């Protein structure tokens, strides 16, 4: 475990098949292939039992059934992948929340790993409040209006100065987290979601900065916000317009659906292994 604390009791909360290889060749179904070596790559995520017990107690108090516990970036990836067990999606998925930034690398439809660091939207709000002499609520409103063409030039200058340093620190966190994946070739697409991604300076920094040059990208990555309309196998049947800030919730819904339908009749190798991991 990353904590190096052998006394921490943990439980497996998320698992998924990343890839199957026979003698170095990636295959979807190994049946019928001949070879000497079969390599199965798995994604697993664990949580301390003390945290899980706390969640279970909250559910008991609220008289709710605990369907599943999920790592946020894994849930977001599940939303992006949908029901297609043979998806070829390759991307870096970033969920920029209020307190953390969660990053996942997806390669050919498999979640290769997840990382997290503790800088999110609230960090930017606190910096804006401090630099501009505002309370937290006013700073949050100003942050949400950052892209408004009606912002006065002097206020714009102060706002940009307030978030500049935080952007640099956040970018360094992204670099370190992605470097920690130790991937030889990173996907050329970065997909953003979460409330923190609403700050345009974040996507602009990723899309135009030189931060990627020290990492194994073949070229400058393409950066985009995840559109709920592009999330497969999920339909918004309400009158409410959704945006990238709802993707995390859609991901948790996806994991819940996966859990409830975990005894489905999909007979593919990936599906069988996925069900085996859950048991």
Located regions from the model:
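Acidic, glycine-rich loop-and-beta core segments that form the ion-binding/anion-interacting portion
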Residues: 81-149
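Nucleotide/phosphate-binding catalytic cleft detector across ATP-hydrolyzing
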Residues: 1-91, 112, 146-153, 157-164, ...
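Active-site proximal loops enriched in glycine and acidic residues that flank catalytic Cys/His/Asp
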Residues: 105-107, 115-116, 178, 194-195, ...
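Conserved phosphate-binding/catalytic loops in two-lobed NTP-binding clefts
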Residues: 208-247
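A polyampholytic, Gly/Pro-enriched intrinsically disordered region
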Residues: 8, 89-94, 135-142, 237-262
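Residue-level signature of catalytic and energy-coupling elements of molecular machines
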Residues: 59, 95, 128, 192, ...
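Glycine-rich phosphate-binding loops at beta-strand->alpha-helix junctions
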Residues: 185-214
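A general structural motif
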Residues: 97, 166-176
């Amino acid at each position: 475990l990353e904590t190096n604390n052998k006394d921490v009791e943990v439980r497996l909360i998320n698992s998924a098949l990343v890839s199957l290889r026979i003698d170095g060749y990636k295959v979807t179904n190994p049946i019928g292939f001949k070879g000497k070596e079969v390599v199965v790559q798995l994604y697993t995520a664990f949580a301390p039992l003390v945290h899980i017990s706390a969640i279970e107690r909250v559910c008991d108090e609220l008289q709710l059934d605990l369907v599943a516990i999920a790592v946020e970036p894994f849930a977001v990836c599940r939303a992006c992948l949908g029901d297609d067990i043979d998806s070829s999606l390759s991307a870096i998925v970033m969920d920029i929340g209020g307190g953390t930034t969660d990053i996942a690398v997806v390669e050919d439809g498999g979640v290769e790993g997840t990382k997290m660091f503790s800088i999110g939207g609230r960090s930017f709000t606190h910096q804006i409040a401090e630099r501009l002499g505002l309370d937290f609520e006013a700073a949050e409103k100003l942050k949400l209006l950052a892209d408004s063409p009606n912002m006065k030039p002097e206020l714009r200058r102060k706002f940009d100065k307030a978030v500049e340093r935080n952007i640099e620190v956040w970018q360094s966190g992204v670099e370190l987290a992605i470097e920690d994946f130790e991937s030889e070739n990173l996907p050329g697409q970065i997909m953003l979601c979460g409330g923190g991604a609403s700050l345009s300076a974040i996507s602009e920094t990723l899309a135009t900065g030189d931060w990627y040059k020290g990492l194994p990208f073949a070229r400058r990555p393409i950066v985009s916000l995840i559109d709920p309309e592009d999330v497969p196998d999920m339909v918004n049947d309400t009158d409410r317009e959704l945006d990238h800030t709802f993707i995390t919730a859609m991901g948790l819904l996806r994991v819940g659906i996966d859990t409830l339908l975990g005894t489905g009749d999909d007979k593919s190798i990936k599906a069988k292994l996925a069900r085996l991991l859950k048991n």
